[in-house]
Amino acid sequence: MKKRMLALAAMSLALALALAGCGGDSKAAQEATEIEEAMAVDGLAIPVAELTAEPSFIDWEQDGIAMQLLALVNDDGEVQLAYNTCQSCAGSPYAYFEYANGMLICQNCGNRFGLDSVGRVAGGCNPKPVSDYSEDGDAIVIPTSELASVAPAFKTWKKF
């Protein structure tokens, strides 16, 4: 447990330093926070302290496939998680969402999706919910098996 807390603290510091160097040059339409590095602990660990009511875009590589997740904290203090891939447009290189004016917008079909449903609505033109994760107080942990099961949906992705 002590090693895990030290790793969590080190990664949080690295993340804070990385985020401090970001800014100024971001796309105007992309109003959300981008968490560029998350911690690896037999999967992906996302520091809860870094999340806000605006969606964070979390980059991850699984089995050589670049992926991205959305994470935010709602008004009730609950974490909402989803993969940044459109379930209806899956297979399209543009089946991902960008955030603008309080909405997530599918870059393939243009559907607008409200933040209140992130991670809660399955099926349709919306981000795919993360089905297996745990909270350990300081971080949300998504196991490698969960990430590996969804990675194929990102194979044709053109966001990166």
Q: Residue ranges of each PLM-predicted region?
A:
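N-terminal pre-ligand scaffold of iron-sulfur
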Residues: 28-98, 130-160
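Processing junctions and N-termini across compartments
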Residues: 16, 80-83, 100-103, 119
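C-terminal motif of bacterial Sec signal peptides marking the signal peptidase cleavage site
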Residues: 17-21
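Bacterial signal peptide processing site
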Residues: 23-25
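Iron-sulfur (Fe-S) cluster-binding segments and ferredoxin-like electron-carrier domains
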Residues: 92-100, 111-120
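Short cysteine/histidine-rich metal-coordination sites, predominantly Zn2+-binding motifs
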Residues: 100-109, 120-131
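Bacterial N-terminal signal peptides that target proteins for export
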Residues: 1-9
